[in-house]
Structures are given as C-alpha cells and as structure tokens.
Amino acid sequence: MNDKEILEVYNLIKEYHAKYLAQYGVKLPSLKINGRYTRSALVLVYLCRNYPNTAVVSKDELTQFIRQFYPNTTDVQQARHLGAQSGWYISSGTRKDNVSLSLSDSEYHLETLERCYPGFTA
C-alpha cells in the first residue's frame, strides 16, 4: 500500500469510528506520531483494506507489511490488542472467536466497523 491508499483507508476508518464506535469507547489509533506511521494504525488499515469485503490476514502477512515501515519488526501483536483490548471487531484464530470463518491460530479478520468487539467495555 502506498501513502495515498493508507490515508484513504484510515479516513474511512475514522468516519466509521466517529459514527459507530467512539460512543462505546473504542480507541482510534493515531495515524502518525512524530511524522511516522504508528504500528497500530498500519495494522488496522491493512485489516480494513477493501472494506466491507475484508480478507483473512495472517500474522506473517501483517509482519511483512509493518516491516516496510519498521524494518526490524519481528512479531506483530497489534491485531490481537486492537481486538479484545481496544474494542475493534477483529476476530483471531488464536481466540477462536469467529463462528462464520475458520481461522488458523495465526490469522485475523476484521468483521465490521459498525460494531465493537463483543463484550468490550472501555
């Protein structure tokens, strides 16, 4: 993804966040801090590509994407944290919290930007 695509997807996320998620305390990660993309924003953007037709994404795929901006990244944990801890409705194969898709242990899927993670409390 190039800078323009990242910004377009992030702006879409911001719109949905303001309309559906902010009221529940779901935190929107900053796109940039000190001129650099944040890892959390990049992971969220990558998971939201082609919304609402989002794809299942592996941890390895996320790590490769983040390495374009942070070359020394060894392991990306942000997808898991954005889900259960921050309220984004991201299913994880490790948590086995998706009943509609069969996800392996190292896969994630953004379910929707219109509802927060089930059971999330800010």
Residue ranges and their predicted role:
Residues N11-C48:
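Short alpha-helical segments that sit at the start of domains
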